[in-house]
Amino acid sequence: MPALATGSACDTGLYELLAALPAQLQPHVDSQEDLTFLWDMFGEKSLHSLVKIHEKLHYYEKQSPVPILHGAAALADDLADELQNKPPNSEIRELLKLLSKPNVKALLSVHDTVAQKSYDPVLPPMPDDIDDEEDSVKIIRLVKNREPLGATIKKDEQTGAITVARIMRGGAADRSGLIHVGDELREVNGIPVEDKRPEEIIQILSQSQGAITFKIIPSTKEEIPSKEGKIFIKALFDYDPKEDKAIPCKEAGLSFRKGDILQIMSQDDATWWQAKHEGDTNPRAGLIPSKHFQERRLALRRPEIVVQPLKLSNRKSSGFRRSFRLSRKDKKTNKSMYECKKSEQYDTADVPTYEEVTPYRRQTHDKYRLVVLVGPVGVGLNELKRKLLMSDTQHYGVTVPHTTRARRSQESDGVEYIFISKHLFETDVQNNKFIEYGEYKNNYYGTSIDSVRSVLAKNKVCLLDVQPHTVKHLRTLEFKPYVIFIKPPSIERLRETRKNAKIISSRDDQGTAKPFTEEDFQEMIKSAQIMESQYGHLFDKIIINDDLTVAFNELKTTFDKLETDAHWVPVSWLHS
């Protein structure tokens, strides 16, 4: 806080005025007693002290110190919650102890009260004996500075009255506690609003700075205080309120990107929730479409779309299935577990909206999270996985695929493949024991759920690459998968960096390598775009494989953080 000035020319002038007043008033005073009273009053030390205090406060108001934030207490609570998820050490324990002290909490609360100017007197409740037929008018004066008022209004189509539609959490109106949903607005700064449209009233409010005076008729409906705990959601789509024609007030909207974590501040409105970005120190909330409303309008907008597992072209594609032998040109090869029995689950993926999440940090006794790698053919996913395995064979592991193909002389059961009969394979398929499977040259190949469990049971990080539509079924409490999408660079960079590289061919069973073609590059880009468009909301991390070394280092850093830092995961994974 800036120090107050100790004196000014204005102070001296006022003191001289006080000293001169008795002499100036003497001709108008009838008795010596009255004159003595005036001399005593204007010479009183307490009066001079009050004048001095007035001058100091006047000087302080001119300085207008602006608080850095209005929600220090809430920020301290959020910090304490965040520290609870950090590995404990002496400094963290000391800080948590400090933040939990009552005097520190009280200090932060007082700071917020002053910063929010919430010290104005609150009007007493309306008397019980008031005449029901007589409207009780309330005059409210708010100081909003340059921030929005934090309330939306609407016009009642039947009565024509202008009423408060919603109060934005953390805004000036909410902090004042004087304006409530349903209050009828009669005047703004002395201007009657009965015959005005909401847009005109908003214009009046936007042009008003400093103090705003409202004349309102309080709503007779009693508000029920919200008792919601902290709710966090992960946004599964991009949103710009300026492009949304349905939002009641574009200025009150909150924009976000796919993958952003939002804190829900209010779900009172079934259509429009109030939220803010997680970690944002600004206490004001913004409007976002509710989950039900967003799902409904997206479903109505795209009724003709039926989500199907990702399919690539039927040309001779490059490469086998990565986790097991699989020709991409066979239309009936690529199947995922539950595809037949639970195909309706794909419908939900067509309209991704929000997912409730919570922080999760792996404890030392927990199994490692399953790492799922997704990417188009030729992007370098196999090479990245190979480099990871070579970097630490004791820490990383991969699944051994099952097959019905006959074992060759140089192969060992359980090393290259787990060899089983066709009957047993088909039985396991019926029992949903495969994550995904396919058929190649009349032989089945597949990755089983038990093979993933086997790697995790060895206290290793299981590296699994699958088709993107399979990811949905792996997102369970047991595996807690972390999904990484390996994305190709631009087609110009592909031409430049992959011109001498080769891709595995599917023309023979030996996996012959052949140079990349222009068609391979175009197919890679197209496939990546489809994957990101349809399944991007399931990806936790996107790594562009422009340079293999750079991509590998980024992947390694991501894994290190995954094992030590807290990450947002679906609530169902921890509360099932």
Swiss-Prot record:
Q: Where, by residue number, does the polypeptide cross the bilayer?
A: none
Which GO biological-process labels does this protein carry?
bicellular tight junction assembly; positive regulation of protein-containing complex assembly; protein localization to adherens junction
Q: Where is the Guanylate kinase-like domain?
A: 368-560
Q: Which UniProt keywords apply?
A: Cell junction, Cell membrane, Cytoplasm, Membrane, Phosphoprotein, Repeat, SH3 domain, Tight junction
Q: Where is the PDZ domain?
A: 139-220
**L27 domain residues:** 10-65, 67-122
Task: Enumerate the PROSITE patterns for this protein.
Answer: GUANYLATE_KINASE_1, GUANYLATE_KINASE_2, L27, PDZ, SH3
Q: Which residues carry this modification: Phosphoserine?
A: 409
GO cellular component term of the entry, any: cell cortex
Region feature (Phospho-regulated basic and hydrophobic (PRBH) motif): 289-383
GO molecular function, a single term: protein domain specific binding
* Bilayer topology term: Peripheral membrane protein
SUPFAM superfamilies attached to this UniProt entry: L27 domain (SSF101288), P-loop containing nucleoside triphosphate hydrolases (SSF52540), PDZ domain-like (SSF50156), SH3-domain (SSF50044)
Q: State where it is primarily located.
A: membrane
Modifications after synthesis and translation: Phosphorylated by aPKC which promotes dissociation from the cell cortex.
Question: Localized where?
Answer: Membrane; Lateral cell membrane; Cell junction, Tight junction; Cell junction, Adherens junction
Q: Where is the SH3 domain?
A: 228-298
The family database entries (InterPro entries) matched by this protein are listed as: GK/Ca_channel_bsu (IPR008145), Guanylate_kin-like_dom (IPR008144), Guanylate_kinase_CS (IPR020590), L27_C (IPR014775), L27_dom (IPR004172), L27_dom_sf (IPR036892), MAGUK (IPR050716), MPP7_SH3 (IPR035599)
Q: How does it assemble?
A: Heterodimer; able to heterodimerize via its C-terminal L27 domain with LIN7A, LIN7B and LIN7C. Forms a tripartite complex composed of DLG1, MPP7 and LIN7 (LIN7A or LIN7C). Interacts with DLG1 via its N-terminal L27 domain. Interacts with PALS1 and PATJ.
Query: What biological function has been recorded for the protein in this entry?
Result: Acts as an important adapter that promotes epithelial cell polarity and tight junction formation via its interaction with DLG1. Involved in the assembly of protein complexes at sites of cell-cell contact.
Domain comment?
A: The phospho-regulated basic and hydrophobic (PRBH) motif is sufficient and important for interaction with phospholipids permitting cortical localization. Phosphorylation of the PRBH motif by aPKC inhibits the association of the protein with the cortical membrane.
Q: Quote the protein name from its UniProt record.
A: MAGUK p55 subfamily member 7
